[in-house]
């Protein structure tokens, strides 16, 4: 009976062994073991130069977070999001860097209809996140190479739907000048001609003005709600970029006025290029050094001609030469051969 029972259980054991890789794959995709908490965060050397300036877009507009990385040895890649109007921690979409399948999607609650894509290239990888932006989903999105405890942040994309400025009550409302491209240090928008603003009350004696990009279907009727008075989480990044137009942006503390420092003296305009000026200076320096050396050589010749004695000078004639040897008899042939 024992042998028969063991024979009956062999097919079941064989089936379990064959299905183990599938179970492991299913468990890794459905119940991920990776977490969104990164113990050690590092930034790439070209992190600031490759990160574009913050962009101001309209609510409901579709945006894509493109992440492009070169060939690496990290086991996972991710898109890490920190939302401007949320006090919670960061959420993260984690993908396997080898196969490209999803390990964890912490953005599914904030972005339920978002789609992601992963492409493996010969020299690198491209992974992206596409969603419709809103006030709740505006924030900072970072491209990260990571493992279970460490992460290397490669790029940062800042998506904004509203931009807060302050103006004095007795001054007209300022209009910020938005850029047209993502390069540089100026906040930009792909549609700056649709810029609108609305009043959101007072803040520390200043008039709160919120600028937004109007919708194409209802630019004059629709207005977003005024946010809280507290500065958002994106302010630490936004304040690094320029916003021309004589506008005061909100700050967590009153601004500190620095003393005026004297301006450096202006350069004298010679009408010549700097390379021509350097060439003339080098030419004059060379000839000045050559002239000094030549004068020193002439002085040496003149001084030595009068003060330095030469061989044979100042002696009686003939005493300066060696006398020829004298022989009593001419040497024979045998002596010559020696």
Curated annotation (Swiss-Prot):
- Effect of altering residue 323 to C? In strain: Isolate 13J and Isolate 51C
Which keywords has UniProt assigned to this entry? Answer: Glycoprotein, Host endoplasmic reticulum, Host membrane, Host-virus interaction, Membrane, Modulation of host NK-cell activity by virus, Signal, Transmembrane, Transmembrane helix, Viral immunoevasion
Enumerate the Cytoplasmic topological stretches.
300-338
Q: Impact of mutating residue 202 to T?
A: In strain: Isolate 2J, Isolate 10J, Isolate 25J, Isolate 39J, Isolate 45J, Isolate 29C, Isolate 27C, Isolate 18M, Isolate 33 and Isolate 14
Fetch the Pfam families from UniProt.
UL141
Signal sequence range: 1-25
- Which residue ranges does UniProt annotate as crossing the membrane? 279-299
> Which terms in the GO cellular component ontology are assigned?
host cell endoplasmic reticulum membrane; membrane
Where does the UniProt entry place glycosylation sites?
117, 132, 147
Mutation: residue 139 to S; reported impact is:
In strain: Isolate 10J
Q: What is its subcellular localisation?
A: Host endoplasmic reticulum membrane
Its induction note reads:
Early-late protein. Increases in abundance throughout the viral replication cycle.
Q: What's the impact of mutating residue 30 to L?
A: In strain: Isolate 8J and Isolate 16m
Q: How does it sit in the membrane?
A: Single-pass type I membrane protein
Q: Which Gene3D superfamilies match?
A: 2.60.40.3790
The source's domain of life comes to Viruses
Q: Which InterPro entries match?
A: Ig-like_dom_sf (IPR036179), UL141 (IPR031918), UL141-like_sf (IPR038504)
How the protein assembles, per its UniProt entry? Interacts with human PVR. Interacts with human TNFRSF10A and TNFRSF10B. Forms a homodimer that engages two TNFRSF10B monomers.
Report the function annotation for this chain.
Answer: Evasion of NK cell killing. Blocks surface expression of PVR which is a ligand for NK cell-activating receptors. Binds human PVR in the endoplasmic reticulum and prevents its maturation and transport to the cell surface. Targets also the natural killer cell activating ligand NECTIN2 for proteasome-mediated degradation. Additionally promotes intracellular retention of TNFRSF10A/TRAIL-R1 and TNFRSF10B/TRAIL-R2 and thus down-regulates their cell surface expression.
Q: What is this protein called?
A: Protein UL141
Organism, as annotated: Human cytomegalovirus (strain Merlin) (HHV-5)
